[in-house]
């Protein structure tokens, strides 16, 4: 059975710009399916049409060029909408927010907040990544979720996946070059605050998972097979399968998925009532499932078409 905490990590990869981990492959064989669609939807009201693209926040360079239908939808749009505009926040500002949301107060540390056995395993894993010990001293002042993010980011980079090639960043930079207006649903402070609001138990489980289950190339390939082929069914399985069996995680999903989807749909409806075409780029996990953005818009009577 897939570890449920891995599925939380997977969701964060495809639904938060500040992401952490990836779920193991399901038994679904995405390689044997034949899909001709992209992870892009055209959504129409009586007066306007917009486009909604599911993003993955880290990728390999060879993901580009993207499907022509995606680029054409971008070209037709006057305004780009992302979860957060990560091109509009400096590294210094992000660093200050990270210290505010993820750093322990003076006199406290990761070592004093987790078991000695877990800290020993964390230290061993981090020293594998950085034998100088600098990274370990840095990590020790941060909460478990920050350390989990750091470890998994190294996993991504070692496999050749980087936020530099993330789909959201690609379109934000493109919009800046083309002089298109950029809007954001959330802020970096809001997203970091969601991580920080996770219980100690969930944060520690995320940290254990980052140590015990390093991201693999096969996992990432399965994810991108689903994305490249527009396989929304497999993406939904990767995000949601088995969650209903664990009420504690269902509550967490309600907070980090459903509540955010409802707020995004409210804003999307305002775009659909206007006369300007918007190109919305959000994590692919936001688009699938009963409370996914696409299904919510469909239930409200808007026409949704996967391209």
Where are these regions (language model features)?
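Bacterial N-terminal signal peptides that target proteins for export
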Residues: 2-10
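A conditional alpha-helix N-cap/helix-loop micro-motif detector
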Residues: 33, 63, 164, 257-261
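A cross-kingdom marker for long, charged
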Residues: 250-307
């Amino acid at each position: 059975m897939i570890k449920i905490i891995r599925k939380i990590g997977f969701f964060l990869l495809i639904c938060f710009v500040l992401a952490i981990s990836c779920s193991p492959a399901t038994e679904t064989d995405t390689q044997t399916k034949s899909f001709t669609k992209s992870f892009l939807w055209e959504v129409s009201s009586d007066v306007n049409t917009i486009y909604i693209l599911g993003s993955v926040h880290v990728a390999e360079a060879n993901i580009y060029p993207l499907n022509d239908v995606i680029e054409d939808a971008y070209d037709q749009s006057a305004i780009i909408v992302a979860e957060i505009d990560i091109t509009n926040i400096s590294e210094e500002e992000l660093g200050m927010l990270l210290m505010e949301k993820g750093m322990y107060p003076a006199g406290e540390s990761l070592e004093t907040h987790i078991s000695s056995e877990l800290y020993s395993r964390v230290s061993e894993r981090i020293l594998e990544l950085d034998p100088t010990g600098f990274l370990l001293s840095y990590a020790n002042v941060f909460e478990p979720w920050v350390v989990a993010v750091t470890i998994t980011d190294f996993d991504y980079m070692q496999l050749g996946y980087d936020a530099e090639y993330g789909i959201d960043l690609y379109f934000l930079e493109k919009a800046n070059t083309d002089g298109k207006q950029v809007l954001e649903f959330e802020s970096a402070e809001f997203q970091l605050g969601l991580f920080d609001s996770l219980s100690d138990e969930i944060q520690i489980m995320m940290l254990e998972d980052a140590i015990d289950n390093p991201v693999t190339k096969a996992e990432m390939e399965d994810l991108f097979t689903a994305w490249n082929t527009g396989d929304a069914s497999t993406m939904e399985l990767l995000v949601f399968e088995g969650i209903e069996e664990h009420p504690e995680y269902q509550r967490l999903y309600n907070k980090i998925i459903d509540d955010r989807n409802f707020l995004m749909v409210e804003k999307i409806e305002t775009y659909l009532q206007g006369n300007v075409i918007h190109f919305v780029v959000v994590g692919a996990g936001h688009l699938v499932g009963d409370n996914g953005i696409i299904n919510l818009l469909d239930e409200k009577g808007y026409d949704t078409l996967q391209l």
